[in-house]
Amino acid sequence: MWLSNSSVGRKVVMSVTGIALVLFLTFHMAMNLVAIISADGYNMVCEFLGANWYALVATAGLAALFVIHIIYAFWLTMQNRKARGSERYAVVDKPKTVEWASQNMLVLGLIVIVGLGLHLFNFWAKMQLPELMHNLDMHADTLTLAYAANGAYHIQQTFSCPVYVVLYLIWLFALWFHLTHGFWSSMQSLGWNNKVWINRWKCISNIYSTIVVLGFALVVVVFFVKSLLCGGAC
């Protein structure tokens, strides 16, 4: 199949899944900002996105996008390493036209994956998962189930801890680098690769990625500061 047998096809898959994930991040960031404005409003969104059939279908689709994106990322990385052979061990000057993020996308991607695991542990495992277990008549802790739709509570608990705050900010820093390169690179792979448009996409990537990451970081910092003012830091 062309999408898996050719380098161009794999890049197209990477690009399409990457753009879809960027759109999800935008929605997720906007949703999180609601928590700063209104805890009740945020909890309403969380309840709407609980263990309902449409939310579960969306979650499954999102998980598939992540898995495909990660698999193809490693696949392309290994392919590029194999193509370079022993040349990759040679000491040469780094090309000025090659960005730092481009040279370290694998490392940045690994940090993003670890951060994703941490995020799933702190939120998905305490919110949608208990509701899903309850709906399937599986054992779910009563207290955990009671707080499953209280997203504001989980944000407050997570970001009152300085360790989590630092880890999340490191994760977001890596995500920013990953997005700034990945966004315009995706457009390039999809054909927007002439000199005029590639420069425009690089500019758009930097602005867009900065807005998204700052939105996430704002939630982390605001809730941490609130916890300090309330004396609730762990």
Identify the residue ranges that each predicted region occupies.
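Membrane-embedded alpha-helical bundles that constitute the cytochrome b-like, heme-associated redox core
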Residues: M1-C234
